[in-house]
Regions:
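Primarily extracellular Gram-negative trimeric autotransporter adhesin
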Residues: 1-7, 106-111, 117-127, 344-355
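Charged, amphipathic alpha-helical linkers/stalks
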Residues: 1-43
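Outer membrane beta-barrel translocator domains of Type V secretion systems
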Residues: 37-271, 391-415
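Extended hydrophobic secondary-structure segments that form protein cores and membrane-embedded regions
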Residues: 138-139, 182-185, 277-282, 333-338
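Conserved small-residue
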Residues: 140, 212, 277-278, 333, ...
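Extracellular/periplasm-exposed beta-strand and loop segments of Gram-negative cell-envelope proteins
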Residues: 147, 156-158, 189-202, 230-257, ...
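Solvent-exposed flexible segments
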Residues: 263, 274-289
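Outer membrane beta-barrel transmembrane domains
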Residues: 269, 297-415
């Protein structure tokens, strides 16, 4: 154990090697099984499994947790967008289409008026929905996604797959200009490390939240707040080192709070296309501190990690337009892109120790991810009637070191 660098990397340092060196020097009897297995192991095998010995994947899992919580929040955000654009009520796109069809032929023939954009006035054009009295809605969305946290610099990558369902109800007030709603979601995430790191984990999430939309003559203001309970079940093994291959299991829980605020200006072109510059788009998420214990095996770890905080601030653009079908249905395609800068944590860290010698601590860190975050969405809403709507969305997210792509299917009913 003279070469402590054998057990280290750039992200976590050589703390594991120093801890093992101290245990060997002190002849810690409780560590004899681990020290003996490592002493007779091949150096190349030790180098390959150093990240698994440190428990780096537990730190990477914390980044995957933020992706899980963010996926649920994205479902709520997409529902709000679909409702505003004509999903569960006569939204802005439908109003814009009505405005465009009402324009005179002479006005439409002028090049300037064809290209000029004017403000949408939801309050003036939204009387049909109010007159119909349909101001309460129930909705449901199923969602699934696959993502990856890239490996590098001695940290193994982590793949994560998410699936779940979200339910909600909302009501419209103030002549349909204000929407208040609540949401409930349940989701499962399965994770597996790459590059032979021998780690897998399952996370169950239960999420509850509330949201509000406020339309005004020049655009809208949207906000949402959510609480998420997270329950983890992880399994770790040290491959290729005799005596350390038994699976190590840990179960632990923590939670997250998240919030989103978004403002947009609304414009419409002469042909009914609604253009909405988004400024600002602010996302906040905080996952609470956590700790785990893998039992009493020779390589079992105990670990603690502080809270992880994400603060994203940025801007974007979204477009949508409503088309009338041959059978009276309304179809509203949507597109959205948002750029944000991460002002919070871009790396997760644990302070770990072996269960046999918990006072000998070392660091385990995830791979750092980028500060520039790009998200996008392509979706369509089909309204078969004034009461029933169906939504389909493709969503994606990209930053240095992390990607995610997903699909959402939704159903809304207004009464």
């Amino acid at each position: 154990f003279d070469d402590t660098r054998l057990f280290g990397n750039a992200a976590s340092g050589d703390g594991l090697g120093i801890a093992l060196q101290q245990a060997a020097a002190q002849r810690t009897s409780s560590m004899s099984g681990l020290l003996g297995a490592l002493q007779f192991a091949d150096r190349d095998d030790i180098a390959r499994q150093a990240g698994a010995l440190r428990g780096d994947a537990h730190a990477s899992l914390r980044l995957a947790d933020t992706a899980l919580v963010g996926s649920i929040g994205n479902v709520v955000q997409q529902h709000q967008a679909a409702s505003r654009s004509g999903g569960d009520a006569d939204g802005l796109a439908a109003q814009a289409a009505q405005t465009a069809s009402a324009q005179s032929a002479t006005t439409g023939s002028r090049l300037f008026n064809q290209l000029a954009m004017h403000l949408v006035a939801p309050a003036d054009a939204g009387s049909d929905a109010g007159d119909a009295g349909h101001n309460r809605s129930f909705w449901a969305r199923g969602f699934g996604s696959h993502g990856r946290i890239e490996g590098g610099a001695g940290v193994a990558g982590l793949n994560h797959t998410i699936g779940g369902i979200a339910l909600g109800a909302d009501t419209r007030l103030a002549d349909d200009r204000v929407t208040l709603g609540v949401s409930l979601a349940a989701a499962d995430m399965s994770t597996r490390s790459s590059e032979g790191a021998g780690f897998s984990g399952d996370v169950r999430a239960l999420d509850i939240g509330g949201y509000v939309d406020a339309l005004y003559s020049r655009g809208y203001l949207s906000a949402a707040v959510r609480y998420t309970d997270l329950r983890h079940d992880t399994r770790r093994s040290i491959e290729g080192i005799e005596g350390l291959q038994a699976p190590l299991r840990a179960k632990y829980s923590n939670d997250a709070i998240s919030a989103r605020v978004e403002h947009a200006f609304s414009f419409t072109t002469g042909n009914g296309l609604v253009i909405q510059p988004l400024l600002p788009v602010i996302d906040y998420m905080r996952t609470s501190a956590t700790h785990f214990n893998e039992g009493q095996h020779a390589a079992a770890l105990i670990g603690r990690s502080g809270s992880l905080e994400s603060i994203r601030v940025g801007a974007g653009l979204q477009l949508f337009k409503t088309f009338d079908g041959n059978n009276g249905e309304r179809i509203t395609p949507r597109a959205r892109v948002v750029w944000q800068k991460e002002l919070g944590d871009t790396q997760a860290r644990y302070s770990n120790g072996f269960a046999a010698a918990p006072d000998l601590l070392f660091s385990a860190s995830s791979q750092p991810v980028g500060e520039q975050v790009l998200t996008w969405n392509l979706g369509v809403t089909s309204r078969a009637s004034k009461r029933l709507s169906v939504m389909v969305d493709y969503v994606g997210e990209r930053r240095d070191g992390q990607t995610q792509n997903g699909i959402q299917l939704g159903l809304g009913y207004t009464f």
